[in-house]
Amino acid sequence: MLAVLGNHDWHANRRDEVAAALAEGGIDVLERDHRILEVCGAELGVAGTKGFAGGFDGAHIPDFGEPLLRAVYAESIREAAALDAGLRAIALCPFRIALLHYAPVTDTLEGERPDIWSFLGTDRLAGPLREHHPDLVLHGHAHAGTFAGRVGEVPVYNVSVPVLGEDFWVFEMTGAARAPSEVH
């Protein structure tokens, strides 16, 4: 089982403690990393990173101003670069998933107050998704958001528990269409 940490996991500098507890339970935390797994005889590549805040077209946090604001910008750029590197590393896998915490698209933020969207994700994460076309993108964080969206032709799903109304959701990866189908 794979996971990425979210903002609550990082709160109060408890990242290592949370990751260790997950590892004890057999959960591998991806942090600017990737894994290639064999599932039913086929390779499944997963690129995982937290992502970060940063805003969307017309409302990006810029690389300008106070050092703390510029640090937010820099972190969003580092996370997008990590996603790009992870997707490059799994490019030859027949099935590819991007696993994020923050949203890469506003489609899945509908339902949240628009004035907080910049804190819920950034479309800087969408660039690597458009370039590498993973089969499935999963994120959380937007607890009042919407389940499904897209980055171009790439399906994006907000799988936060409040949005799902369930503890988990099952996606079936089909080889013929190279697109996930819901199996809920």
Residue ranges and their predicted role:
Residues 1-7, 28-33, 97-100, 129-145, ...:
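Active-site neighborhood of phospho(di)ester-bond hydrolases with catalytic His/Asp-centered motifs
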Residues 2-20:
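Acidic/His-rich segments in extracytoplasmic proteins that coordinate ligands and/or metal ions
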Residues 9, 51-54, 143:
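Short, flexible micro-motifs
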Residues 12-13, 107-108, 147:
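Short N-terminal helix/helix-N-cap motif within the alpha/beta-hydrolase-1
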Residues 16-117, 160-162, 173-175:
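Conserved catalytic scaffold of divalent metal-dependent phosphoesterases
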Residues 37-40, 110, 123-135, 143-184:
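Binuclear metal-dependent phosphoesterase catalytic core
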Residues 73-74, 78, 141, 183-184:
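Structured catalytic cores of enzymes that bind and process phosphorylated ligands/cofactors
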Residues 83-90, 121-131:
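A short, acidic, amphipathic alpha-helical segment used as a generic capping/interface helix at domain edges
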